Design a protein with these regions (language model features):
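Extended intrinsically disordered terminal tails
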Residues: 1-143
């Protein structure tokens, strides 16, 4: 029971630390959200630019969004490649932290399950030990 509570306490400390880490990463993501959205829009709407320039009707709105995205990226002063690498790294870190959070929560859940089932497990162990002693006595008598 003491070992179980120690494992649970460590898992809860780890979870709290991971939650703080995730909050920090989410704040960083939120600060750059406009740039990350512009990066995605510029990439996704590049074909709309070609269509607009070739005179295809109905491409005014996507082209305007494309131009807004390109303008935002040019004004930020960060190269697109650097911004893409930063975004990819941030999302990778978030995925890693989220995976660790799920693992810590699963560990806490297992501790809860073990604690809930402990009385029954202890009972089963006592029954098995008593049965083993009984078998041992019977074998001793037969000799």
């Amino acid at each position: 029971a003491e070992d179980l509570s120690a494992v649970r306490a460590r898992a809860e400390e780890t979870l709290a630390s991971l939650m703080k880490q995730r909050t920090i990463l989410n704040v960083r993501k939120k600060k750059r959200r406009a740039l990350y959205d512009a990066l995605s829009d510029a990439e996704a709407l590049a074909p709309a630019r070609d269509c607009y320039e070739s005179g295809m009707p109905g491409m005014e709105e996507p082209f305007a969004r494309y131009m807004d995205a390109v303008s935002a990226l040019e004004q930020c002063g960060i190269h697109r490649e650097q911004l893409m690498a930063e975004k990819a790294e941030l999302y990778r870190q978030l995925a890693d932290v989220n995976r660790e959070i799920r693992r810590a929560r699963k560990e806490i859940s297992m501790c809860d399950t073990i604690e809930r089932n402990r009385p029954q497990m202890e009972h089963d162990i006592h029954v098995a030990e008593a049965k083993a002693k009984e078998v041992e006595r019977d074998e001793y008598r037969r000799r």
